[in-house]
Amino acid sequence: MFLRTESLKQYVRLYPVTTVLICIHLVVLGLMEWTGSSQDSRTLLRFGALFDLPGMVPEWWRYITAMFVHIGFAHLFFNSFTLYVFAPPLERMLGAWRYALLYLLCGIAGNLASAWFHSDYFISAGASGAIYGVYAAYLFLAIFRKDLIDQQTKQTVITILVIGFLQSIIVPHIDLYAHFGGFIGGLAVMGLMSLFIKRRHLRQRAELERQLQQAEQELQERQGEPE
């Protein structure tokens, strides 16, 4: 499910929301580097990072914008690559607008948790909260909709979550609260969406994703055969 074999043109056509999200990440970081530095506090705040500073209350819109801001190239690459690999199947299953809504709500949930639980000075940015919401959506489907998520995918998601949360606890300067908030948000939003999305609709989209992946793999194998 998470093996990406599409060409760039196919990827953009099949997964428009994920493509737009990654492009926004790249554009924002490029502008930050052009006008300052993506690791400079003032530049981060100017471009919408979340913060908690003495005597200041963050504007409401930062809970949205912070998920598109990244602190350095490594931060950008890791989050964007994770989106590139793991988000497409969920976008196909939910459809573009539902997936976009889930992503945004999970990112906001992560930023709200970050602001709520941090008690001292901090600046927070990145798509990690939203990404953990995507993981949570897969986990929800793996538990409650086993017809959509195979066992291997379930094990992959659980392994990533365990490693991710351990890393969030052990490695300094990683926003555990944002990850946890996004994860809880993902479970909640996916749970609500599952009540309103017809089971047949999800099943058809999941089967379509499997068929597309299989067709792409077969095409690549044929292209690799000698004439």
Predicted segments with their positions:
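C-terminal transmembrane module of polytopic alpha-helical membrane proteins
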Residues: M1-V17, C23-I24, F165-E227
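N-terminal TM1-TM2 helical hairpin plus the immediately adjacent luminal interfacial "cap"
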Residues: R13-A125, P172-I174
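Cytoplasmic-side transmembrane-helix entry/capping segments in multi-pass membrane proteins
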Residues: A96-L104, G126-I131, Q151-I158
